[in-house]
Every structure is written in C-alpha cells, then in structure tokens.
C-alpha cells in the first residue's frame, strides 16, 4: 500500500466496458515526511474519496483483489481514506486539522 493525496479526477468518456461507472482519481504520492513527491498515479476510487484527502491505495495484483476489481483492468485502487498518520510518535497528518 502507498499514501497519496487526491489532486483531481480523470474523466474518460470512451473506455473498456467493465470500467463504465468507475470513478478515477489523480493521486500525488506522499513521502515518509508527509511531503508531496513529483509522482502521480491514476487510481480507481473504491471508497468515495474527495479532493485533497489523503488516501491509501494498492497497486498491481493487490489492486485486483479488491471486491469489484477482480475482472477489471486496473493497476491502482483507492482502498481507504486516511484519518491520521504518525511517524516516531509524532503526528504527520490529521484529516480534522487539514481544513484549519
């Protein structure tokens, strides 16, 4: 699993039929210090994540084990919305503090 921040959505009007109705998110990867990396990933949204939320996502074969993704050609799926992240007992991110 990896941590990313939702930076936007990706819309595709023409796609593989099994992907119809799937919401795609543009994720910016986050490093161990909580800083954004210059790397992005498009992921199917499995949890209803919104703009600027920090999320957990899985890639590769793990992404295809998520319910509903088994028969879809996905490489990445958002599997959780993060509430808090701590490193060495220090808070790194808190969803409730995000909008202060």
UniProtKB/Swiss-Prot annotation:
GO terms for molecular function: structural constituent of carboxysome shell. The keyword Manganese does not apply. The keyword Oxidoreductase does not apply. Pfam families: EutN_CcmL (PF03319). Its main location: other. GO terms for biological process: carbon fixation; photosynthesis. Keywords: Bacterial microcompartment, Carbon dioxide fixation, Carboxysome, Photosynthesis. SUPFAM superfamilies: EutN/CcmL-like. Homopentamer. Interacts with full-length CcmM. This is Carboxysome shell vertex protein CcmL. It comes from Gloeobacter violaceus (strain ATCC 29082 / PCC 7421).
């Amino acid at each position: 699993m990896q941590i990313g921040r939702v930076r936007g959505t990706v819309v595709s009007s023409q796609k593989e039929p099994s992907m119809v109705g799937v919401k795609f998110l543009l994720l910016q990867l986050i490093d161990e210090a909580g800083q954004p990396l210059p790397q992005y990933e498009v992921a199917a949204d499995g949890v209803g994540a919104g703009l600027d939320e920090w999320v957990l996502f899985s890639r590769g074969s793990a992404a295809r084990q998520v319910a509903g993704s088994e028969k879809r050609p996905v490489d990445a799926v958002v599997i959780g919305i993060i509430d808090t992240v701590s490193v060495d007992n220090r808070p790194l991110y808190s969803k409730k503090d995000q909008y202060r």
